[in-house]
């Protein structure tokens, strides 16, 4: 039997980096949306919606890839609390990548607005229009976006810690391809 790979599968790595760029863009677009009342606001909304749906679709693909391919093992000398932190942070990242787009979609539905991906593609509403539900979902979407931002920062810090301080191959497992 061959030794487990030290690297993630190519498709897993491609999805990781594509989604990392999309999520960073989404966080900045979202911040720009809530901070702007200019004409740019409408343009940012029209970027935010389809990008959120794309992230939702890609995270589903990513979960299929994650559960159908082998993951490189964490270093054997990694302290137990760091192993737990790695596992929990990945669960949180995946949960947020699933929940935030769904909350956004539900929020727009609760506002009574059409969920438009483009000028000709409209998604069905997830909820009926309700101002109270909209207000609750809007707050939840905002708070969870902050949580996603903090989780991404922790993920990045952990990756750099593994790459620059521990030099244990964890960062390289998502950057490089061949063993």
Residue ranges and their predicted role:
Residues 1-179:
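Membrane-embedded alpha-helical bundles that constitute the cytochrome b-like, heme-associated redox core
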């Amino acid at each position: 039997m061959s030794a487990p790979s030290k690297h993630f599968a190519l498709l897993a790595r491609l999805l990781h980096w594509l989604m990392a760029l999309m999520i960073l863009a989404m966080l900045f677009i979202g911040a720009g949306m809530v901070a702007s009342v200019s004409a740019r606001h409408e343009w940012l909304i029209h970027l935010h919606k389809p990008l959120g749906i794309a992230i939702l679709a890609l995270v589903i693909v990513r979960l299929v890839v994650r559960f159908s391919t082998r993951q490189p093992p964490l270093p054997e000398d990694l302290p137990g609390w760091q192993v737990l932190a790695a596992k929990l942070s990945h669960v949180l990242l995946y949960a947020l990548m699933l929940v935030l787009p769904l909350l956004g979609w539900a929020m727009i539905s609760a506002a009574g607005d059409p969920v438009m991906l483009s000028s000709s593609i409209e998604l069905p509403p997830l909820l009926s229009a309700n101002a109270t539900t909209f207000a609750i979902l809007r707050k939840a979407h905002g708070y969870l976006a902050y949580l996603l931002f903090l989780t991404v920062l922790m993920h990045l810090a952990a990756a750099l810690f593994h790459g620059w301080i521990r030099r244990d191959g964890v960062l390289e497992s998502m950057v490089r391809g061949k063993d």
